[in-house]
């Protein structure tokens, strides 16, 4: 697989923009002291900057495509961490399952109620 200098530059710019958004998000998280992770805030920063046209999608696409292509490798450290702390996971299995089911039910009921309000009660 051959890479041209233009492709390499596109990857550098793309990763630079992604990491800049991550850094800004981490800074906002640290500055505000919120419990929302900096990576999530950074993703929102990147989304908003693309939505308002500050950053073009074509600038971010090469790096994002590469990350998505090899995403499975990014789950290896998480899997190893889960195996290392499996006893803690089992000890907290009931709260984890309850919060997953409860959260899903809350989202389902809220979304159903909201859609009925927006679309009108046609059923």
Curated annotation (Swiss-Prot):
Residues annotated as transmembrane: 8-28, 35-55, 71-91, 94-114
The membrane topology of this protein is: Multi-pass membrane protein
Where, per UniProt, does this protein localize? Answer: Cell inner membrane
* Chief place where the protein resides: membrane
- The name under which this protein is listed is UPF0299 membrane protein VV1471
**Pfam families from the xrefs?**
LrgA (PF03788)
Please report the organism this UniProt entry assigns to the protein.
Vibrio vulnificus (strain YJ016)
Choose one Gene Ontology CC annotation of this protein and give it: plasma membrane
Instruction: Determine if Hydrolase is one of this entry's keywords.
Output: no
User: Which keywords does UniProt give here?
Assistant: Cell inner membrane, Cell membrane, Membrane, Transmembrane, Transmembrane helix
What family classification does the UniProt entry report for this protein? Answer: Belongs to the UPF0299 family.
Matches recorded under InterPro entries:
LrgA/CidA (IPR005538), Uncharacterised_UPF0299 (IPR022957)
Q: Which PANTHER family match?
A: HOLIN-LIKE PROTEIN CIDA-RELATED, UPF0299 MEMBRANE PROTEIN YOHJ
């Amino acid at each position: 697989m051959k890479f041209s200098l233009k492709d390499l530059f596109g990857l550098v710019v793309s990763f630079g923009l992604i990491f800049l958004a991550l850094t800004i998000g981490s800074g906002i998280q640290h500055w505000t002291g919120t419990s929302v992770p900096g990576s999530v805030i950074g993703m929102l920063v990147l989304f908003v900057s693309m939505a308002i046209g500050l950053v073009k999608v074509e600038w971010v696409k090469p790096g994002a495509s590469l990350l998505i292509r090899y995403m499975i490798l990014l789950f290896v450290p998480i899997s190893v961490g889960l195996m290392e702390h499996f006893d803690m996971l089992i000890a907290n299995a009931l709260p984890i399952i309850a919060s997953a089911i409860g959260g899903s039910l809350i989202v389902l009921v809220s979304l159903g109620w909201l859609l009925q309000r927006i679309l009108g009660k046609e059923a």
